[in-house]
Amino acid sequence: MGCGASRKVVPGPPALAWAKHEGQNQAGVGGAGPGPEAAAQAAQRIQVARFRAKFDPRVLARYDIKALIGTGSFSRVVRVEQKTTKKPFAIKVMETREREGREACVSELSVLRRVSHRYIVQLMEIFETEDQVYMVMELATGGELFDRLIAQGSFTERDAVRILQMVADGIRYLHALQITHRNLKPENLLYYHPGEESKILITDFGLAYSGKKSGDWTMKTLCGTPEYIAPEVLLRKPYTSAVDMWALGVITYALLSGFLPFDDESQTRLYRKILKGKYNYTGEPWPSISHLAKDFIDKLLILEAGHRMSAGQALDHPWVITMAAGSSMKNLQRAISRNLMQRASPHSQSPGSAQSSKSHYSHKSRHMWSKRNLRIVESPLSALL
């Protein structure tokens, strides 16, 4: 989950992302002393002990604090273990002393208290104090979307469809409740467990909007992650849940290629590209991608919000209905991984010079997929047109 301008803990995983397995003692051989991993673990234990001391006694009575796994402008996320069941959970601690923190907390809780869906992270219980709110939630331990893709040896269009079915099903549920996520991106799509058949969980509702009882479902707040933001948001127009469908189109493009359809180091140039809505299917692995897959993307990345597919229509698209039956079963994993590495590398601008280590992706690419996270910096509209 996220709030305000959330950021990741380095080198640990993001809020509500997978918690690294507790490693064995990494002490060096022959009395060489502890290695860097052991030192990092020791430092984390000290950090957790200090953090635990500030926890509400009611929380400590029910949960053992295991690790700090994420932080945001108004929050910290820790991995915990329920004392009686030994089941792992995540606790998000929201600081509510300041107005911004209170508003973020109220916004997030207004959504989480309403949702219950197999593809959406579940709020389990809440503890409140004068200055803090503790949200106990499901813990996704299976890793981020692209971490899993790189780690596995094979990835086909059918694998992509299976993922997108779960995401679209979750979005359809949210939209039926008049809830708009407003920050859909790969980092917020987590595997529930490490198993091969794990489901996907939609997480991070820090920017989500819950429709008013009056029936007014339009929004005006300029927020989101720039690479995934819909053009109507940039134009300062009142917008609807169709912004989530634009983001799903961006995610689909990235999932099939390892690249983003709209990308630029300059935020102003990035916004111009989004407003033009022009992208292409050049380079690997696009020649191997089916026409139906591209049609699915094309029906989402439409400038006119009212013409985009809804989540229900996305689930009924022929590419999804047939589970990509007419598509090539070619393994796309190598090309996608290479493109992910290329984008992660600050020195590489071509597939041929892309780095290939998984660790390089883990440390670099996560920051590249959403270089300017959450609430975006406003630019004069005239500069974008």
Swiss-Prot record:
Residues 342-367 are annotated as: Disordered. It comes from the Eukaryota. GO terms for molecular function: ATP binding; protein serine kinase activity; protein serine/threonine kinase activity. GO terms for cellular component: cytoplasm. Keywords: ATP-binding, Kinase, Nucleotide-binding, Serine/threonine-protein kinase, Transferase. Belongs to the protein kinase superfamily. CAMK Ser/Thr protein kinase family. This is Serine/threonine-protein kinase H2. It comes from Homo sapiens. The lineage of its organism: Eukaryota, Metazoa, Chordata, Craniata, Vertebrata.
